[in-house]
Amino acid sequence: MKRAIIILLAAALLLSVVGCKKEAKKTTLTVAMSPDFAPMEFVDTSKTGQDQFVGFDITLANYIAQELGLTLEIKPMSFDACQTAVQLGSVDMSISGFSWTAEREENFLLSDYYIAGDNETEQSVITVKAKEGTVTEPAGFAGWKVGAQAASLQEKLVQEALIPAGAELVVYKSIDDAVLALQTGKIDALAVAHGNGEAIISNNPDIAFTGYDFEVDPKYENNVCLLNKNSTELLQKVNAALAKALAAGVYDGWYNDAKALAGISTASEVSYNDDGTAPSN
């Protein structure tokens, strides 16, 4: 009899614990970002904690979190790790300058488009200052080593447009590593979003645009948020927030503010490790 009572009490306790878990209200929106992509997402080294992460996408993420009644928590990590984290469900979503691609549509739920500015729809190639303006056609990259960030739209564009013309693709985990490779002669050029190229050039006077811009299919021109395939309810809420932001006409102001912030002395593109730890100096 005592054993039966103990079992019943244990079962009741278990049910109450399960019930409490079900009733627990979500308070945080976790968003994976790779803060090495100014002016979209980067770091203000004069600040610490969550406040150090700045840029257009951070402003957008804060807006979405506020619309959902949640507190934003940025989870910094490498660009390809952001995508893995969404697939594994270890974060709610990722906002990190993602363009639409067929592969992303297959592997994720994609939000409606958001527009960060004309400079983020153009895709360009940068090189050392001595070669500024010397290449305007794909054929001009024959024999060149052209870098791109892993799992990025730029990697795809190099594969489609420059490799057939005789270029060699070199993939880097981070933009920082790719820029260093360009400066040290390990690669001849680097494919970038035009706005990111402007930010890189403003901080590195030894780098310039080649003069070549990719011909980009319009479907690649706007940005999307990545969500797990099972997050249909969250996707609806995110899309509602994006629609409200678009109707309010706030995107241009956010982008201009981010560009200005990317030019301050404490602005830095920081490449985090896959596990979210800060790089060692």
Question: Which residues does each predicted region cover?
Answer:
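Short, low-complexity disordered leader/linker segments with a strong preference
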Residues: 1-28, 279-281
